[in-house]
Amino acid sequence: INRDKKQLLLVLGGPNKYYSYDRNNLEKIFENLKNLAKKYDLQIIIIPSMRTPINTIEHASSFFDKETIIVKNVDKKAYLSALSISEFLVITCDSTSMISEAALTGKPIYVAQIQSKKDDYRFRQFRKLFTKLNIIRNLEDKLEVWNYEKLDETNRVANIIKKKIYCHF
């Protein structure tokens, strides 16, 4: 980790029935991140998920320079550490669960769009809600810091249950 730079984390999902991880989609995302890292003097960290194909990780390794940290295997400690130390989070659009996990941090989350193979209505509705809640923005050519209320559904629901229980006594 380069302590003289802020970190930008890219969490890669993987192909599913809605999204393919073809070279063109990846090239657009990688090129955009490379430009943002240069523009804002950032170090990139790339973390795979269970669905990330090995050839996607290999492509990232050949595309980025040696300053980019690429975790080659799924590693929960590396994932949680990277979420913690990174100033900016970029998550591919194919994973609602990784976007939700990132929203627990309260940090700016950018969604890297991938062309869908078929109607991705459920994914679009999820992203529409998170955009409305000011949690996510589309990855483009600039980075900003913004605030939103962290998602903490476990405590929120626990408090509702407590109130309902106390009302019965």
What is each residue range found by the language model?
Residues I1-F169:
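Nucleotide-activated sugar donor-binding and catalytic core shared by glycosyltransferases
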